[in-house]
Amino acid sequence: SDGRNTAANDKASDLMALRDGCCPNPSCSVNNPDICGGGR
């Protein structure tokens, strides 16, 4: 596989970890609407 796919996968897993840790926390979720879906 090429390096770009590896980097993208690493970034995606970081984002999922951040989402899992952040989005249940209202103040973090509000500050990160792009990862937590916002717009409610």
UniProtKB/Swiss-Prot annotation:
Subcellular location: Secreted
Organism per entry: Conus quercinus
Ranges where the record places region Lacks the Ser-Xaa-Pro motif that is crucial for potent interaction with nAChR: 24-26
Protein name: Alpha-conotoxin-like Qc1.4b
Pfam families per the UniProt record, alphabetical: Toxin_8
Domain-level remarks: The cysteine framework is I (CC-C-C). Alpha4/7 pattern.
Residues bearing the modification Cysteine amide: C36
GO cellular component, one term: host cell postsynaptic membrane
